[in-house]
């Protein structure tokens, strides 16, 4: 069975939600502790949402320096699929696995709603089951989701098809309506909205989030 690691930092909130989404996709979630460098031989890693280390210094900055991230950086450079959700996206940027940074929302308010996203790239491990330009609905909740990068970085992301999702109604001021991006290899994806909160009709946010986890399963099955 496919085994997907779900990291828990001090202040992580959504690790259990991510684990449930993994189970619904047919894989086994494996808990990974922030203070350990052992990735337990998992096939992929999820950095879930929350407020790691209370967002002190900068959101994701202290988590980026934790022992588990040293192992994840090496593994990601070797091709391990990694998904960073909300605070996990912030950690990926602070770890320099993804470029840019996430700043306070443009209106300086915490934002919580179901967001419509447009799929901008299906050429990643985590989006290969979506259709190009497909519009999906994913829950979002963040106070520091305003994606910012210098002009050269944004131009490179656009030119190399590394913008993965865009907001259709930008809730936070992110440059170019960017909701998520990927690395050059397409194995590391970060986004602010929460696909793990959009996997069951019961929650009211639909099931479009399952596409992330099913995409991973499709990718891994093709590697066998």
Swiss-Prot record:
Keyword Ribosomal protein: no
Compartments (UniProt record): Cytoplasm
Pathways per UniProt: Purine metabolism; IMP biosynthesis via de novo pathway; 5-amino-1-(5-phospho-D-ribosyl)imidazole from N(2)-formyl-N(1)-(5-phospho-D-ribosyl)glycinamide: step 1/2
A biological process from GO: 'de novo' IMP biosynthetic process
Residue positions of the active site: 86 (nucleophile), 194, 196
GO CC, alphabetical: cytoplasm
Ranges where the Glutamine amidotransferase type-1 domain occurs: 3-224
The EC number(s) this enzyme carries: 6.3.5.3, 3.5.1.2
SUBUNIT field: Part of the FGAM synthase complex composed of 1 PurL, 1 PurQ and 2 PurS subunits.
Protein name: Phosphoribosylformylglycinamidine synthase subunit PurQ
UniProt source species: Cutibacterium acnes (strain DSM 16379 / KPA171202) (Propionibacterium acnes)
Encoding gene per record: purQ
């Amino acid at each position: 069975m496919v085994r997907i690691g779900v990291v828990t930092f001090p202040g992580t909130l959504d690790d259990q939600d991510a684990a449930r989404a993994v189970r619904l996709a047919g894989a086994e979630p494996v808990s990974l502790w922030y203070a350990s460098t052992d990735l337990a031989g998992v096939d992929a890693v999820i950095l879930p949402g929350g407020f790691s280390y209370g967002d002190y210094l900068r959101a994701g900055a202290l988590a980026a320096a934790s022992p588990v991230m040293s192992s994840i950086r090496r593994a990601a450079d070797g091709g391990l699929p990694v998904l960073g959700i909300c605070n996990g996206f912030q950690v990926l940027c602070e770890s320099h696995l993804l470029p840019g940074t996430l700043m306070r929302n443009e209106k300086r308010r915490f934002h919580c709603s179901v967001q419509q996203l447009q799929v901008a790239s299906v050429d990643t491990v985590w989006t290969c089951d979506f259709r190009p330009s497909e519009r999906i609905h994913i829950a979002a909740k963040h106070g520091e989701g305003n994606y910012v990068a210098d002009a050269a970085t944004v131009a490179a992301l656009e030119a190399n098809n590394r913008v993965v999702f865009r907001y259709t109604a930008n809730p936070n001021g992110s440059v170019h309506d960017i909701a998520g991006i990927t690395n050059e290899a397409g194995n590391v994806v970060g986004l602010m909205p929460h696909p793990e909160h959009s996997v069951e009709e019961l929650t009211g946010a639909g099931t479009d989030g399952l596409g992330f986890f099913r995409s991973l399963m499709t990718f891994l099955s093709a590697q066998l």
